């Protein structure tokens, strides 16, 4: 009976294919003579049978059924034969094709047509770290050692190396079976923001235990001649995922077996592995910076032109590390933009130094990880208010001119780690920045220190009464007097129990409230004016001055008032065109009354509404139409009477209408009145007495 050589126990009928015809010419290796089976024969299907001619029981324990491989090699795939997980597989070893044994290429799915072929491989060389024959004596079963030599997997190898991707409590959330790392290895790949990887030909053993395996670790070569490696920290097992966390060019990116995850493509395995990295520390609260769930601090290489002490690395023990910002070491390094040879200083949220300095002593070590987080850059994380943030040189706020003494570099970072304030080019932003700088010096405490006397409301009410009698006709004066008389008893009742200290406190409340309103007026683009309960202007916006032509200094009584426009006709008597100086007999300047800014009918209507809101609805408001009087001197009134000016103003309306500040200034040029709508309300003080009249003005809709 003729026997066949080189056939497996369960060889399918394709043994006579073209691939096997080529291997027949090659023959078996010299050091592995062909085996014969005297007790077995081959049937027509190529299956071995016992000598009695009966087919063996497939469930016989002495003949276990071969497990189907996750991916067949190229030769077995082409011959449609059962392959194994190991590389080279047993069939290729028997045929002498161990050097050419590699994973076969499957047909890509439609959604993976754009993916590169290399990314669809389950692992480099199809390594399976969970297989018993995958690793032997530190040499991968693929037959390729890290130093470049090709080896053949020995069938007698019994020692294996496995990776626990799913961590157990005994592994302390570690990705590996941990031992102190005291070995080095490199990969010939480099990332633009990562250390330079160099190729070492003699990897050192991981430890001296009997079951030692020659695994490999990552080392970094520095730009300077000297090289530094990973620190031999005794607590390295406490820090999984050390080193550069996300470096696409690093071959040891995730350090777990992708082929063992039973994924058809590399994309899915990487995504699942990334989620596993994040989940391993999701429930932890890093207290010493040793690990952060998905990234550790130790294990990375140092980056300094001169190592401190010669052995200062990133593998520090927990007691030597500072508590990171929110337990995250990357948050301390957002604005880092230094080169690899430049020392970097991290500033934590809570300074730990007892000498009063902002920077703890151990933070001055130039050991920052030389990598940026995803989508981060040197200048992408400049906080708004960088000029007022705690800087490196002092523990308090620095002045704005302190940046003039700092020598900065082209990348926007200064020598001592400070950042230049962001450049503002937009005019509106420049104005806003200047306003912020001005408001920074304003202190509300000055309000309480400056007010020493109560405000003379009685004398100002007398001045208002005299002005009303001088300007308005007797009929309209009577209407205004009736409105004020209706609220006079309420004023007397609320003020009769107030002493001098109460009146001073009332004025302090007024000034403090006005201090807040000034910021609102500057930020709001609506014409706004704020008056006391006597009607005196206390604050005004720039837009109101543009609309009416009244200067802010004139309204506040800081400049003389030469206005002669009272809203009457040209035939008015002489008292209506007599200018009233803001400096009266007392010699003190006084603000303009609100009644001087409105025409006669609007003033009467205003005081009638004021009598209703003064002690009525505290949240009520009035919205109505009015006519504001433009600020006009005697020369302006004479010029407005000429026909040429009137014709020119009519032509202006027909051509371009109202536009910009110049167009607003032309409003009311002919008759000296600006018809508009306004909304105003009354704000009361702590004694429930009317304190402020806040008025917003806008042009009516056409």
UniProtKB/Swiss-Prot annotation:
<dbReference type="GO" id="GO:0006094">
    <property type="term" value="P:gluconeogenesis"/>
</dbReference>
<feature type="region of interest" description="Disordered">
    <location>
        <begin position="281"/>
        <end position="320"/>
    </location>
</feature>
<comment type="function">
    <text>Transcription factor which regulates nonfermentable carbon utilization. Activator of gluconeogenetic genes like acuF, acuG and acuN.</text>
</comment>
<feature type="region of interest" description="Disordered">
    <location>
        <begin position="159"/>
        <end position="246"/>
    </location>
</feature>
<feature type="compositionally biased region" description="Polar residues">
    <location>
        <begin position="165"/>
        <end position="200"/>
    </location>
</feature>
<dbReference type="GO" id="GO:0005634">
    <property type="term" value="C:nucleus"/>
</dbReference>
<keyword id="KW-0539">Nucleus</keyword>
<dbReference type="InterPro" id="IPR056751">
    <property type="entry name" value="PAS_13"/>
</dbReference>
<feature type="region of interest" description="Disordered">
    <location>
        <begin position="565"/>
        <end position="586"/>
    </location>
</feature>
<dbReference type="InterPro" id="IPR036864">
    <property type="entry name" value="Zn2-C6_fun-type_DNA-bd_sf"/>
</dbReference>
<dbReference type="InterPro" id="IPR001138">
    <property type="entry name" value="Zn2Cys6_DnaBD"/>
</dbReference>
<keyword id="KW-0238">DNA-binding</keyword>
<dbReference type="GO" id="GO:0008270">
    <property type="term" value="F:zinc ion binding"/>
</dbReference>
<feature type="region of interest" description="Disordered">
    <location>
        <begin position="1"/>
        <end position="66"/>
    </location>
</feature>
<dbReference type="GO" id="GO:0000981">
    <property type="term" value="F:DNA-binding transcription factor activity, RNA polymerase II-specific"/>
</dbReference>
<feature type="compositionally biased region" description="Polar residues">
    <location>
        <begin position="297"/>
        <end position="320"/>
    </location>
</feature>
<feature type="compositionally biased region" description="Polar residues">
    <location>
        <begin position="218"/>
        <end position="240"/>
    </location>
</feature>
<dbReference type="GO" id="GO:0000977">
    <property type="term" value="F:RNA polymerase II transcription regulatory region sequence-specific DNA binding"/>
</dbReference>
<dbReference type="Pfam" id="PF24990">
    <property type="entry name" value="PAS_13"/>
</dbReference>
<feature type="compositionally biased region" description="Low complexity">
    <location>
        <begin position="201"/>
        <end position="217"/>
    </location>
</feature>
<feature type="compositionally biased region" description="Polar residues">
    <location>
        <begin position="565"/>
        <end position="585"/>
    </location>
</feature>
<keyword id="KW-0805">Transcription regulation</keyword>
<feature type="DNA-binding region" description="Zn(2)-C6 fungal-type">
    <location>
        <begin position="73"/>
        <end position="101"/>
    </location>
</feature>
<keyword id="KW-0862">Zinc</keyword>
<dbReference type="GO" id="GO:0009267">
    <property type="term" value="P:cellular response to starvation"/>
</dbReference>
<keyword id="KW-0804">Transcription</keyword>
<keyword id="KW-0312">Gluconeogenesis</keyword>
<protein>
    <recommendedName>
        <fullName>Transcription activator of gluconeogenesis acuK</fullName>
    </recommendedName>
</protein>
<dbReference type="InterPro" id="IPR050335">
    <property type="entry name" value="ERT1_acuK_gluconeogen_tf"/>
</dbReference>
<dbReference type="GO" id="GO:0003700">
    <property type="term" value="F:DNA-binding transcription factor activity"/>
</dbReference>
<keyword id="KW-0479">Metal-binding</keyword>
<comment type="similarity">
    <text>Belongs to the ERT1/acuK family.</text>
</comment>
<feature type="compositionally biased region" description="Polar residues">
    <location>
        <begin position="34"/>
        <end position="55"/>
    </location>
</feature>
């Amino acid at each position: 009976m003729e026997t066949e050589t080189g056939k497996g126990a369960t060889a399918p009928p394709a043994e006579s294919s073209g691939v096997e015809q080529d291997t027949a010419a090659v023959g078996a290796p010299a050091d592995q003579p062909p085996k014969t089976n005297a007790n077995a024969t081959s049937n027509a299907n190529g299956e071995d049978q016992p000598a009695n001619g009966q087919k063996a029981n497939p469930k016989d324990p002495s003949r276990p059924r071969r497990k189907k491989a996750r991916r067949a090699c190229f030769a077995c795939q082409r011959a449609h034969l059962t392959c194994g997980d190991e590389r080279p597989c047993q069939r290729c070893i028997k045929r002498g094709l161990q050097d050419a044994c590699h994973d076969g290429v499957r047909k890509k799915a439609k959604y993976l047509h754009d993916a590169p072929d290399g990314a669809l491989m389950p692992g480099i060389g199809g390594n399976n770290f969970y297989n018993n024959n995958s690793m032997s004596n530190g040499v991968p079963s693929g037959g390729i050692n890290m130093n470049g030599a090709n080896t053949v997997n020995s069938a007698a190898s019994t020692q294996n190396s496995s990776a626990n991707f799913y961590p157990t409590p005994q592994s302390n959330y570690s990705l590996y079976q941990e031992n102190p790392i005291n070995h080095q290895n490199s990969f010939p790949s480099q990332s633009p923001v990562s250390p330079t990887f160099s190729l070492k030909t003699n990897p050192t053993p991981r430890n001296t235990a009997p079951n030692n395996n020659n695994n490999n670790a990552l080392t970094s070569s520095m730009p300077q001649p000297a090289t530094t490696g990973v620190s031999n920290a005794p607590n390295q097992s406490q820090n999984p995922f050390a080193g550069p966390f996300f470096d696409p060019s690093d071959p040891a990116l995730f350090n777990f077996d992708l082929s063992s995850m039973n994924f058809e493509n590399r994309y899915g395995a990487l995504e699942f592995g990334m989620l596993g990295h994040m989940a391993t520390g999701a429930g932890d609260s890093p207290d010493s910076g040793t690990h952060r769930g998905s990234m550790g601090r130790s294990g990375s290489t140092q980056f300094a032109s001169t190592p401190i002490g010669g052995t200062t690395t990133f593998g520090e023990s927990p007691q030597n590390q500072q508590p990171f910002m929110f337990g995250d070491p990357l948050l301390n390094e957002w604005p880092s933009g230094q080169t690899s040879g430049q020392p970097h200083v991290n500033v934590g949220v809570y300074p730990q130094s007892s000498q009063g300095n902002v920077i703890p002593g151990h933070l001055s070590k130039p050991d920052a990880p030389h990598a940026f987080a995803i989508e981060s850059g040197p200048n992408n994380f400049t906080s708004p208010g960088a000029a007022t943030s705690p800087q490196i040189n002092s523990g308090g706020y620095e002045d704005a001119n302190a940046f003039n003494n700092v020598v900065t570099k082209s990348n926007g970072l200064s020598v001592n780690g400070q950042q230049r304030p962001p450049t503002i080019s937009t005019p509106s932003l420049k104005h806003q920045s200047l306003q912020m700088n001005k408001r920074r010096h304003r202190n509300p405490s000055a309000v309480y220190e400056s007010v020493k006397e109560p405000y003379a409301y009685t004398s100002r009410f007398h001045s208002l009464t005299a002005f009303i009698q001088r300007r308005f006709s007797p009929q309209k004066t009577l209407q205004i007097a009736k409105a004020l008389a209706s609220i006079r008893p309420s004023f007397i009742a609320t003020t009769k129990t107030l002493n001098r200290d109460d009146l001073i406190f009332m004025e302090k409340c007024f000034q403090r409230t006005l201090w807040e309103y000034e910021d609102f007026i500057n930020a709001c683009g609506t014409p706004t004016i704020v008056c006391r309960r006597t009607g005196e202007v206390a604050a005004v916006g720039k837009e109101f001055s543009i609309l009416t032509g009244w200067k802010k200094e004139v309204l506040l009584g800081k400049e003389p008032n030469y206005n002669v426009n009272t809203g009457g006709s040209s035939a008015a008597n002489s008292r209506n065109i007599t200018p009233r100086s803001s400096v009266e007999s007392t010699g003190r300047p006084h603000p303009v009354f609100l009644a001087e800014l409105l025409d006669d009918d609007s003033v009467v209507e205003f005081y009638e509404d004021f009598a209703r809101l003064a002690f009525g609805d505290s949240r009520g408001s009035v919205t109505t139409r009015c006519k504001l009087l433009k600020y006009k001197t005697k020369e302006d009134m004479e010029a407005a009477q000429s026909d040429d000016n009137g014709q020119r103003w009519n032509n202006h309306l027909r051509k371009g209408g109202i536009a910009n500040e110049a167009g607003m200034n032309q409003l009311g040029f002919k008759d000296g009145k600006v018809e508009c709508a306004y909304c105003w309300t009354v704000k009361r003080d702590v004694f429930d007495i009317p304190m402020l009249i806040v008025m917003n003005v806008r042009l009516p809709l056409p």
